[in-house]
Amino acid sequence: MFSSCWLKSSVRYSRLIRQFSSENSFFKVELVPSDRKTPLQPRKVVAPRFEKKTRQKISDYLKQMATPEIEAKLAPLRAAVKEYGDLIRDLKAKGAPKIDIDKAVVELKARKRLLEDTEIALAPKEASFDRLKLEDLLKRRFFYDQSFAIYGGVTGLYDFGPMGCSLKANMLQEWRKHFILEEGMLEVDCTSLTPEPVLKASGHVDRFADWMVKDMKNGECFRADHLIKNSIEKLLNDKKTSAAVKQDGQDVLARLEGFDNKDMHEVITRFNFKSPITGNDLTEPIAFNLMFPTQIGPTGDFKAFLRPETAQGIFVNFKRLLEFNQGKLPFAAAQIGLGFRNEISPRQGLIRVREFTMCEIEHFVDPEDKSLAKFAKVADQKLVLFSACNQLDGAPAQEVAIGEAVAKKTVANETLGYYMARCHQFLMKVGIDGRRLRFRQHLSNEMAHYAQDCWDAEILTSYGWIECVGNADRACYDLQQHYKATNVKLVAEKKLPEPVDVNFVEAQANMALLGKSFKKDAKKIQTSLQQLTSEQVSALEEELLAKKLYNLSVDGQNYALTPEHLNIKKYTKKIHVQEITPSVIEPSYGIGRIMYALLEHSFRQREGDEQRTFLAFKPLVAPIKCSVLPISANDTLIPVMDAVKEELSRFEMSYKVDDSSGTIGRRYARTDEIGIPFGITVDFDSLKTTPFTVTIRHAETMSQIRLEVSELGRLISDLVAGRQQWSDAQAKYPKFEASATE
């Protein structure tokens, strides 16, 4: 019986091997840029021999982070390994002959080896990404560093150096062009100090919190969900952990986003998790509000907070913005500014910080019509969507056209889908690797009760999938909350096809009697009565008639009203417009997180020289567009240098002159390291013709061309703006072969 089963299974497995070989899963021919003056050479790539720990790291990475294409290739191999693992257990349980078990073990080992080799061959470079080398580069070249470092530093606060500051500024400039200018948005710049009543109305005072646990002996604090995640991942990587415990841990990780304090306490207790620093017991999770409190003015009575998001400044200015837009919907407002969150335990560099730059859009739209004319322009654009259904079913993310996703109601509406597509375009434009970008839908227990749909743009880094952009349909919640708190209507008018007669019922307060009965609370009661809908007033009237008493709840306090406290007014009015509270579609961008992901995705190592690292930014966002390098300090080159600088300045191209005494190769390496995409070399051949000529070197490929200085500014400008690619320049201008190795 075993022999027959083994034979059939082996035949199927042989087909798998032939399939993967034919698809070049293991053997590829690629052209590798040489570091020396040698042409590109074909090189056979095979799965390298990694040590066991590294192979396991790659396998674990692919189980969590594989793209749909990679997962489709690995799934049958994993199933083949599982098949023989189950078969061996079954043979042992039935007391099968040792020779049959040994045959099965040999086959299982072969299948495991094929799976491991395939994982290594298919694994993207980031699976074995060396974060320490990137961090060394960023710190050494001062892209950013911990704030107040000479005083010991403060976790969660960072200062950007010249390169980091310029990179960030270029990203923000491109964001402003991509959204505010192209979409005709209204830009505002609101204060970071926010009075407590504003954030009380928005819900931040009561609900903007994370669950925190403390070391019971020394009081050290940890964010509960992060502690659980890190502890479970440690268990999963421990060979001594049983299969049942690993499965339990994986189930917890899949549901962790929706856990409350009770769920987290149950997990910490069940797995017996301790403090990762001391091993001490932990307290039960408690809520920790993430806002920084402060006071406005000298008395300390005016409570305020540093804003946790920029959105509230737009909401409270809605009436002014609507007026500026001639009262028309839809329209979008945008703001670029700082947000502040008092994180419990900031980790992972720029990914989790206490002060950060946000770019937020609030798109106000008719809640009954969220269609968008411009959606047709992006309907065919494909995005990798990780829907809530796929998450719950354990299925991988899928590449889907956004038009199809909206048509099937996977994405709630056209406006939300449009901003997701535009988000994808922006991230690709600044240099995010499209293979490491997906949109994950919030599960129902993750979303706020008022939200209708939410998709996070997540970028894959060495820390895992990181939420960098939130795209949410917030419905009418925020404007309604601020109306309730201020009694200022935040509505738009929608013209009706034909005038209609509408019956109104209002509760008018008897302020004289309310003042006698309720003193200072009379005004608050009057405001609450004014905010009642016609249906609520009718219910109030019925209760007053039946019981001669009505309990009105305001801010959690009840007030007993009698018929004498108010008058019920009924009337009919012909209306030509309908007042509506707009829904809000909100894309929210965390610039620091996108910037860190970009740094990882742009990090490179020279082939054959792993110590020679550099950053390959897209010219559009590169901190400095080109370097200017004289081949020597000879004074005869000065006129050419001056002409080059004048030409670059004419086209507003940033440049860095490096006229130090090092070799040209060493200077190339220095400028490559900080992400300068183009190097302009002034050599003695530059003087041989009139007008002067120079060479331009492309940092990533190290190829060079020669052209006249008069053409330099236009070419660099076109390369930066994307009007030309480097391949276009190579086709137009003569190739330059360096006379010395770099």
UniProtKB/Swiss-Prot annotation:
Record-annotated disulphide pairs: none
Family of this protein: Belongs to the class-II aminoacyl-tRNA synthetase family.
Reaction catalyzed: tRNA(Gly) + glycine + ATP = glycyl-tRNA(Gly) + AMP + diphosphate; 2 ATP + H(+) = P(1),P(4)-bis(5'-adenosyl) tetraphosphate + diphosphate
Predominant cellular place of this UniProt entry's protein: cytoplasm
A Pfam match: WHEP-TRS
Gene symbol of the encoding locus: gars-1
Function description: Catalyzes the ATP-dependent ligation of glycine to the 3'-end of its cognate tRNA, via the formation of an aminoacyl-adenylate intermediate (Gly-AMP). Also produces diadenosine tetraphosphate (Ap4A), a universal pleiotropic signaling molecule needed for cell regulation pathways, by direct condensation of 2 ATPs. Thereby, may play a special role in Ap4A homeostasis.
All copies of domain WHEP-TRS, residue ranges: 73-129
Protein name per UniProt: Glycine--tRNA ligase
GO cellular component, one term: cytoplasm
